Regions:
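N-terminal beta-alpha lobe that positions the nucleotide/phosphoryl donor
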Residues: 1-273, 278-295
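Short, glycine-/Ser/Thr-/acidic-enriched flexible segments
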Residues: 12, 204, 214-218, 228-229, ...
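Catalytic cores of soluble metabolic enzymes centered on carboxylation/carboxyl-transfer
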Residues: 259, 297-532
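Intrinsic low-complexity, intrinsically disordered segments
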Residues: 477-503, 537-559, 565
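Structured functional modules or segments
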Residues: 538-616
Length: 616
């Protein structure tokens, strides 16, 4: 077994990996960007090293900086988590070239299956049929039009080198193609470092069912069970469950065997997920994720297996020690991804900010995997997953009711969250009766009753039990040698020396609270004085109907300006594109008129309510 592992990631997955490493007696090394210096995953690790930069390209995608941290820390292996460099074959090769163990599949397998086009070829050559599509990448919008005219509309444009719905666009006809291709290429490059895209026929009402596999270097491959991930918005999962409800046992067995067949065909080693679309009794190969999935906890809860531990053991060269007949599944588990998004009206707008309150759900059958604690900041530069709430029950209905209870207890202030939408999903007759699909949230579910900027419903529950002090803030008390009148607090102080972070705890006199508005900005959950201010926003979101002001609905970065001063525009016409939390948001004109002023440039960072353009 490895003795020290560097976790090349952040947030929830870095914390998750660190916990299993601790149970196995493996020392952990965290890496962090400038914004994450005081982040939860840094506090959870035994050591931490600075990568520098704020945006992913300068930090968590910076292979050179990560390998330097691995060298300095003496790590024996690197766990990539999910996202970032987890499906980057060049990174895996670099790790191996430095004499370290990459906790994941071999680089050549990542090359083969991480490329969604070649993965289709592997599956089809092994006799596993895929969704109707093309086995080559697309560079010209005309190719999309030809594909749609031949096989029918709508068409799914997808990133060739990544999953999770990132970079995926669905076009209903030729008029939408050019803008969608450009946007898909931009998002694919931002998320996965490569802009290649490919095409598939978009099925009308499918369910997304994926199969968890694990394989060792001795040639043993087994499937652990399936997950239904059909509750999605923007082709990204909101809720997952294990096992898939109303899936015939013969289909389950066939799907599991198909997943093993694909895994053997590519000589897979490590944990992985083979994804399928299921419709009308048939299933189609979609892609293989050569990494640990976000939703792996539901499989863990039903099988009793620790998938991270399996990853680490297989990476160390150990056999699985587990045969197919040894895998048992008990009960039902549901996971809700608690994202910092405002689901009002079904828009799911990114909502970066500081968690002024975070009360986790607890109790029988409930598990919360979080990447943040109270007082931490959810940055616009990274994924907006705050936590995952998992509920287990002896059957689906028990798990559903337990999840509703857990969501009601989860209290988060400071950012909007997806919790109100997830409560609506769990309470809907279509979900209860398994009449939903991957398109159900956006086409059927009515979220118009959710007020903008609403907080999670756990306020009463957390107030009753008392929310804990924010990590990194002071723990009130008295020092062992202090009298009652001399109130002191136990303060955690951080010091960075030569790129390595050290933490020291000491008793200091309690300081009075500043009575006015916060005169500091938060960086990685820590207050930092001297933050650069910006003008007070004119309002939140786009201006009201008829307004001449186009405003940013959230904090983000301007990545495209689509009009110029003097242009005539119509109400609803796209003015610019704002990227927040790696999602593109198009800002539109709220009236007919002429563009009088463009107040931003490409690359500018704007805050919620900032005016980006004026139309007269």
């Amino acid at each position: 077994m490895l003795k020290k592992v560097l976790i090349a990631n952040r947030g929830e997955i870095a914390v998750r990996v660190a916990r299993t490493c601790r149970e196995l007696g493996i020392a952990t090394v965290a890496v962090y960007s400038d914004l994450d210096r005081g982040a939860f995953h840094v506090r959870m690790a035994d050591e931490a090293y600075a990568l520098g930069g704020q945006q992913p390209a300068d930090s968590y995608l910076n292979t050179e900086a990560i390998m330097d941290a691995a060298r300095r820390s003496g790590a024996e292996g690197v766990h990539p988590g999910y996202g970032f460099l987890s499906e980057n074959a060049a990174f895996a090769r670099t790790v191996s070239a430095h004499g370290l163990v990459f906790v994941g599949p071999p680089p050549e397998v990542i090359d083969l299956m991480g490329d969604k086009v070649s993965a289709r070829r592997v599956a089809e050559s092994a006799g596993v049929a895929g969704v109707p599509g093309r086995s080559e990448t697309v560079t010209d919008p005309a190719q999309v039009v030809a594909f749609g005219d031949e096989l029918g509309w709508p068409v799914a444009i997808k990133a060739a080198h990544g999953g999770g719905g990132r970079g995926m666009k669905v076009v209903a006809g030729p008029d939408e193609v050019a803008a969608a291709v450009e946007s898909a290429q931009r998002e694919a490059l931002a998320w996965f470092g490569r802009p290649e895209i490919y095409l598939e026929r978009y099925l009308a009402w499918p369910r997304h069912v994926e199969m968890q596999v694990v394989a060792d270097s001795q040639g043993n491959v087994i499937w652990l069970g399936e997950r239904d991930c059909s509750v999605q918005r923007r082709y990204q999962k909101l809720l997952e469950e294990c096992p898939a409800p109303d899936l015939p046992e013969e289909v389950r067995q066939a799907m599991g065997q198909a997943a093993v067949t694909v895994s053997r065909a590519c000589a897979y080693v490590s944990t992985g997920t083979v994804e399928f679309l299921y419709q009308d009794g048939d299933f189609y190969f979609l892609e293989m994720n050569t990494r640990l999935q976000v939703e792996h906890p539901v499989t863990e809860e039903v099988t009793g297996l620790d998938l991270v531990a399996l990853q680490l053991r297989v990476a160390a060269g150990e056999p699985l020690g587990l045969a197919q007949e040894d895998v048992t599944r008990r009960g039902h588990a549901i996971e809700c991804r608690i994202n910092a998004e405002d689901p009002a009206g079904g828009r799911f707008q990114p909502s970066p900010g500081t968690l002024t309150r975070f009360h986790r759900a607890d109790g029988p059958g409930v598990r919360t995997d979080a990447g943040y604690e109270q007082g931490d900041t959810v940055s616009q530069y990274y994924d907006n997953l705050v936590a995952k709430v998992v509920a287990w029950g002896p059957d689906r209905e028990a798990a559903r009711r337990r999840m509703l209870r857990a969501l009601g207890e989860t209290g988060i202030d400071g950012v909007s969250t997806t919790i109100p939408a997830q409560i609506a999903v769990l309470s809907h007759p279509d979900f209860i009766g398994v009449r939903h699909s991957t398109r159900w949230v956006e086409e059927t579910l009515d979220l118009s009753g959710i007020a903008p900027g609403g907080t999670s419903p756990g306020a009463t529950a957390s107030a009753a039990v008392g929310a804990p002090n924010a990590p990194g803030d002071s723990s009130v008390g008295t020092s062992p040698d202090a009298g009652d009148a001399d109130e002191r607090v136990l303060q955690e102080v951080q010091a960075e020396v030569d790129g390595r972070l050290y933490q020291v705890r000491l008793w200091v006199p309690r300081l009075p609270e500043w009575p006015g508005p916060a005169a500091a900005e938060r960086v990685g959950g820590r207050r930092q004085a001297g933050g650069r201010g910006r003008p007070a926003p004119a309002g939140r979101g786009e201006g009201p109907a008829g307004s001449g002001q186009v405003t940013a609905p959230m904090q983000g970065t301007i990545i495209q300006i689509l009009v110029a001063s003097g242009d005539s525009v119509q109400m609803g016409q796209a003015v610019c594109v704002l990227e927040a939390m790696k999602m593109e948001n198009t800002l539109t004109a709220q009236r007919d008129g002429t563009v009088a002023e463009i107040r931003v440039s490409v690359g500018d960072t704007v805050g919620a309510g900032d005016v980006v353009a004026v139309i007269e």
